[in-house]
Amino acid sequence: MAPSVKDQVEPQHAKILAIGTANPPNVYYQEDYPDFLFRVTKNEHRTDLREKFDRICEKSRTRKRYLYLTEEILKANPCIYTYGAPSLDVRQDMLNPEVPKLGQEAALKAIKEWGQPISKITHLIFCTASCVDMPGADFQLVKLLGLNPSVTRTMIYEAGCYAGATVLRLAKDFAENNEGARVLVVCAEITTVFFHGLTDTHLDILVGQALFADGASAVIVGANPEPEIESPLFEIVACRQTIIPNSEHGVVANIREMGFNYYLSGEVPKFVGGNVVDFLTKTFEKVDGKNKDWNSLFFSVHPGGPAIVDQVEEQLGLKEGKLRATRHVLSEYGNMGAPSVHFILDEMRKKSIEEGKATTGEGLEWGVVIGIGPGLTVETAVLRSEFITC
């Protein structure tokens, strides 16, 4: 006998049920990093480049970062720090096992917070731009965690920094359209593939060396959380992706024998600032058709660099402190790519509890995740916070 309408559960928006983060053990303080970089790449005699790099580091507003690479690894593999040297095989041999392991560390933290048996995970989304192999990092994570071999897997390669919001969109679709689904989302980046020695002909490398960092995030997403068992953190209400016109040269990365050869245009902050009001307005039209007071929202903005964060703040007319969680992650972790926006949400909900706020979103009801990456692609996710009951 089919259940009556009364017995059927009213479908809900997908919710983030847990967040976990992880970093490699090696901490690099920004004040010491120039000495390290110029020493290991054997460029201590390049005082001109050193002065430029010192200025970039001083303006980065990054205090420390975590990296897989060590001086010992670099000394044993000089092809990694010799600009242009064929080194892709060496890099991938390192990263193909290490990226899933870092993702596993974040996933175990999220699963522990979630508090449910791992057998309840029905879907897995794995996102990385650091390694490419078949079978992929998603397959390796299934083995590392002991997930059901029939878990539904989705692998996202080479999307870049906007993908932290992309995976929330996919997880929302899976959770809301598959009854009882519990989606484990993992983003893991180890930027060894982007590490290069220094050269006069490609100064973009100096910017990457000052900002890029390693980290992994995991979130568990599901609709209709079980009362008294699952504790939602944020509701994923609506998502939207768009390409900023005429900006594809802004962030470019090409896989070459030397690793990822990347290009970072100084126009990126201008592109983001010139379009942020438009794409946020259109994103919130999907929610209630009304423009929001931007200062009434909480924000998780991809920390691609201080100028990008400043432009978002300026163009939206945000009050001081509105991007506190974003700036904290930029300062304490650097730009970790896709995981960054999840680190920001984790920092925000923890700080909200610590400060006695009413909700996980700094005491506010509505908020937005803004992912920014190659394309330039902007991916947004409208979130609704949950009341803090503990």
Swiss-Prot record:
Q: What is the lineage of its organism?
A: Eukaryota, Viridiplantae, Streptophyta, Embryophyta, Tracheophyta
GO molecular function annotations of the record: biphenyl synthase activity
Q: What does this protein do?
A: Type III polyketide synthase involved preferentially in the biosynthesis of 4-hydroxycoumarin from salicoyl-CoA. Can also use benzoyl-CoA and malonyl-CoA to produce 3,5-dihydroxybiphenyl as a major product and benzoyldiacetic acid lactone as a minor side product. Can also use m-hydroxybenzoyl-CoA as substrate, producing m-hydroxybenzoyl diacetic acid lactone as a derailment product. No activity with p-hydroxybenzoyl-CoA, CoA-linked cinnamic acids or acetyl-CoA.
Inducing or repressing factors = Not regulated by elicitor.
List the Pfam families hit by this protein, alphabetically.
Chal_sti_synt_C (PF02797), Chal_sti_synt_N (PF00195)
What domain of life? Eukaryota
Q: Which UniProt keywords apply?
A: Acyltransferase, Transferase
The cross-references to PANTHER family, in alphabetical order and at most eight, read: CHALCONE SYNTHASE, HYDROXYMETHYLGLUTARYL-COA SYNTHASE
* Entry protein name: 4-hydroxycoumarin synthase 1
User: Family per UniProt?
Assistant: Belongs to the thiolase-like superfamily. Chalcone/stilbene synthases family.
Q: How does activity depend on temperature?
A: Optimum temperature is 35 degrees Celsius.
How pH affects activity? Optimum pH is 6.5-7.0.
| Quaternary structure (record) | Homodimer.
GO BP terms = 2-hydroxybenzoyl-CoA catabolic process; 4-hydroxycoumarin biosynthetic process; coumarin biosynthetic process; polyketide biosynthetic process
Do you know which CDD domains this protein is assigned to?
A: CHS_like
* Enzyme nomenclature, EC number: 2.3.1.208
Name the active site residues.
Answer: 161
- Which residue windows are transmembrane per the record? none
Kindly give the InterPro entries that the UniProt entry links to this protein.
Answer: Chalcone/stilbene_synt_C, Chalcone/stilbene_synt_N, Polyketide_synthase_type-III, Thiolase-like
Enzyme class label? transferase
Question: What's the catalysed reaction?
Answer: 2-hydroxybenzoyl-CoA + malonyl-CoA = 4-hydroxycoumarin + CO2 + 2 CoA
